Every structure is written in structure tokens, then in C-alpha cells.
Amino acid sequence: MHPKSQSKQLFRQKYQKSPTLNVYAPGRVNIIGEHTDYNDGFVMPCAINYGTAISGAKRDDHRFNVYAADLDEFDEFRLDQPIIPNPSKKWTGYVRGVVKFVQERCPEFRQGADLVISGDVPLSSGLSSSASLEVAVGKFCQLLGDLPLNNTDIALIGQKAENRFVGANCGNMDQLISALGQADHLLMIDCRSLETVPTPVPEDIAVMIVNSHVKHDLVTGEYNTRRQQCETAAKFFGVKALRDVSIEQFQKREAELTALDPDTAKRARHIVTENQRVLDAAYALNHSDISRLGELMNASHVSMRDDFEITTPEIDYLVELAQSVIGKSGGARMTGGGFGGCIVGLAPKDKVDAVRQIIAENYEKRTGLKESFYVCTASQGVHQC
């Protein structure tokens, strides 16, 4: 059952009444531009047809009762008291954190509610189940309290909740695309100015996602380490963020930085070249040059593997299998924060079955893990449903 239907049905069962407010926020897949968001750079994701639905209704007090359908767990907290983490249930941090920072922006918001949350974004897959949940909660609060927040505000509140309440030092891409996505379009986002430029996905091109089922958990260190290394590199170049370093500027001082700290130099090289790849990818898409876009995706994967060092052998193998079928008709790369999760492929629709088949025949045999294969549609951002 789709989360939109499930959340409504479960709400009636749990609370013996009908929901009066229903919202839905999609997950996302990033086509190109990995780890560039927290470097004030460029990204090019699309919202996907998997996401998080919330059904709810006002209460006549200040209490939030939250039922997470997929985990079969409840949480409750009050909006007229300080909102603090519930360490025994990690998922509650995404809900409580968003409500806390909505209140920080709109101190008058104290309206209680009963909620049911249902989602179908695979957890720990790199498809932004957390951002989808944060944006859905933010939109629910905005509509519940008729608050003066737009969808960009809601995205940034979600990011703040993940940074300061949950403790994952993520950038703003995942929340922005969940909030601002457009059907049938990729969205190039400037993560500094927050400007977005929609780019249509050609009709004959499929967006494929393959989940490696190698679990990743970004709160556990490596992601935050990469972020610190990028900040160290920005200081070395005397700039606010690596977004401000051109490839030429990087190459001039690359040997000097490598002598100081070879790992930091590699991390910076990925970010500086990846930003340029996103700009080149937007140009390629606007000129319907899918072959060039594919080259850029493939190069992005090599950079993540060798310079940013965030892939795994299983992920590299999936990419190799997909690329062997796609050839010059598109591309494939790891997507998401890394250390597991998913790969994304762009290719003509008539190649989908062959990609699915080569992975089904080889991946489990080599890794002992069974992949999940999704063909996705670029979808609308957060909305009432």
C-alpha cells in the first residue's frame, strides 16, 4: 500500500477518527554533485516516487502523539515544554528536532496534534529517508499552525534539526530537493544562494536506482570527518568554502597541500572537480547530450572512489556492472553520502532490463547480498495529499 493511503488508514485505526491534514514529502536521488552541498557548491538531484506521508488532526492541547507505522512505535512530547531528544528511539529525533526549530522560528506555534507517519524510502539506503521525514514534519507543522514559512524555510529547518538535534553534519541538498522538487525534472541547486534551475529529464531516459544493501549510518563519524577535511582545505586556500576554488587555483597549490596533508588534498580535489562536473552536466542535459552526462557521472564515481574514498567494493562492483551495459548511452555512479547505500544509473529505457539482468546474475553471487532495483520517476516536492 502507498504511504499516502497507509497513513490515512492507520490514522483512523489508531485514533478512531479521520485525519484532517495529510502531507507527503519525497525522498531523492542525486544524479551528480556528491558532498558538494556543505561546501556551498552545486548539486543536481531529483525527487523520487518514494517518500514519507503524514496524516494528522489537531488536538485541543499542546501534545504531539506520533505513531511511526513502519517501526510500529509511538512517541509523545509537549509543545509547551522544552523539546529534548528521546535517546531510546533514534527516529524521534527527526520529528522532535523539526518541531523544536519550527518553534524557534515561530514561537507562537504550540498546537498539539495526533499523527501517523508512513514511508517507503528504504532506510539507510542513501535516498534520504531522514530528509523526507523532516520536510514532511515541517510542512505538517506549517499547515497545522498556518505559519509564515515557505518550502525553502521548511527545508532549512529540516537541515538544522539533523545538524543540531540528531547530530549528523549534513548539507542542505536533501531537504531542498524534497521541498522544491518538480515532476519530470532534475533540479540544479546552488547550495550557497539556494537558487534552483529545473532541467527536464528526456522522455526516453530512465532513472534507475540499485540498493546495495550495504548499510550506512552517517552519524557515525566518517561523514563528519570528510566535512572537517573540506573545511581544513578551505582554510588552506583562504576561502569561505571549497566552492570558491577553481580547478586552476587548486592545481597551482595542489603539491603544497599534498605535502602538508595528502588526504585533505584528495578530498579537496574531489570537491573542486565535482562542482565543475555538475555545471558541465547541466550544460550537457540542456543540449540533450546524455552521452556526455554519462561520462561526467562515471568520472564522478571514480573521484568518489579514489579521492573522496567513500565507496565500498560492493558499490564499485554494482557501478561496474551497470556501466558495462549502459556504455556510452548514459552513466552510473554511487549516490548519497557513501559507505554503502545505492547507485544511480541514467540510460535509455530500453536498457533497463539488461541492467537489471546483469546485476541479478552477478551481484549476489560475488557479495552474498541481494540488491533491490528501482526505476524511478522525477517527482513533485512536498505537498498536501
From Swiss-Prot:
What PANTHER family has UniProt attached to this entry? GALACTOKINASE-RELATED, MEVALONATE KINASE/GALACTOKINASE
A Pfam family name for this chain? Answer: GalKase_gal_bdg
Q: According to the UniProt record, what class of enzyme is this?
A: transferase
Q: Which InterPro entries match?
A: Galactokinase, Galactokinase_bac, Galactokinase_CS, GalKase_N, GHMP_kinase_C_dom, GHMP_kinase_C_sf, GHMP_kinase_N_dom, GHMP_knse_ATP-bd_CS
Subcellular location field:
Cytoplasm
Binding of ATP, residues: S124, S125, G126, L127, S128, S129, S130
User: Which positions are annotated as binding Mg(2+)?
Assistant: S130, E162
Any single GO molecular-function term of the entry would be: galactokinase activity
Q: Which UniProt keywords apply?
A: ATP-binding, Carbohydrate metabolism, Cytoplasm, Galactose metabolism, Kinase, Magnesium, Metal-binding, Nucleotide-binding, Transferase
Asked whether the keyword Kinase is assigned, the reply is: yes
| Alphabetical GO biological process terms | galactose metabolic process
Source organism: Actinobacillus succinogenes (strain ATCC 55618 / DSM 22257 / CCUG 43843 / 130Z)
Predominant subcellular localization, coarse grouping: cytoplasm
Name of protein: Galactokinase
| Residues annotated as site: Transition state stabilizer | R28
Q: Quote the catalytic residue positions.
A: D174 (proton acceptor)
Family per similarity comment: Belongs to the GHMP kinase family. GalK subfamily.
Q: Which reaction does it catalyse?
A: alpha-D-galactose + ATP = alpha-D-galactose 1-phosphate + ADP + H(+)
The UniProt annotation places substrate binding at: E34, H35, T36, D37, Y223
**EC numbers on record:** 2.7.1.6
Task of the protein: Catalyzes the transfer of the gamma-phosphate of ATP to D-galactose to form alpha-D-galactose-1-phosphate (Gal-1-P).
One GO cellular-component annotation of the UniProt record comes to:
cytosol
For this protein, the record's HAMAP family field holds: Galactokinase (MF_00246)
| UniProt pathway annotation | Carbohydrate metabolism; galactose metabolism
